[in-house]
Amino acid sequence: MDLWDAIKEMRRLSAEGIPFGFTFMSYDATARASKGVIEVRHARLLKREKQENHRDAEFVEAYLDLDTCQARRFYQPLLMSFNGQKVV
């Protein structure tokens, strides 16, 4: 699945209140480190952040992990799979 098709589908499902799963490679820009592959089993995207609030807002998606009820973020280019389909 194409990266932008996956992001578009994530947004559509989130707007309809339908959870989805995905994996991504973690990256902490401040520490310049990764904690490896992160699997999120049930999530919904949150409203996009503004450039004033996050320097990489155009490349970052905020999501709610429905299993932990934590709001988190991932960098779009680091998305690896969406609902079991590999993202390229």
Question: Where do the language-model regions lie?
Answer:
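Short, acidic/polar N-cap/turn motifs at the starts of alpha helices
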Residues: M10, P19-G21, V60
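Acidic/proline-rich low-complexity IDRs
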Residues: R12, R44-L45, L78
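A short, Trp-centered hydrophobic/proline-enriched beta-strand micro-motif
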Residues: E16-S26
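Short, conserved turn/kink motifs that form compact alpha/beta structural patches or helix kinks used as
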Residues: S26-T68
